[in-house]
Amino acid sequence: MSERTKATLDEFFRRMSTGDTDGATELFADSVAWDIPGATDLVPWIGPRRNRAEIREFYDLLDKGLIKDRFDVERVFVDGPHAVAIGRLRSTIRSTGKVIQTAFSLEFEVDDDGRITKYLMLEDSWHVANAVLP
């Protein structure tokens, strides 16, 4: 299972690095436990999602809301169907011009079919929320 998990995440990050968000979305299962905790009243792209259509909406809102300057995955740890990726990101909020620079971790679970069933992103949500404020 660890090899399947690693292969799925390698493909996910490869697609993301080329801007293929449609392709990355296809790697998710039909039903997903997705969350990016934070101030959902201020930041429209964060919060829970439950299926591919909602994940697609996330990427659309993200692209409208910010410019992705960097998204560097530094390490990926895999244990069976579970994985954690850690890294750093830098983005610019389109509406304010403010920069978000933060470490992040991503928790994943991958099923027997190689589909992502869990995605939990942890980042400096306070910094993100303040960056969208004028």
Predicted regions and their residues:
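Alpha-helix initiation/capping motif
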Residues: 1-2, 44-48, 97
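Hydrophobic pocket/interface hotspot
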Residues: 12, 24, 32, 51, ...
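Short, low-complexity N-terminal intrinsically disordered segments enriched in polar/charged residues
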Residues: 1-30, 133-134
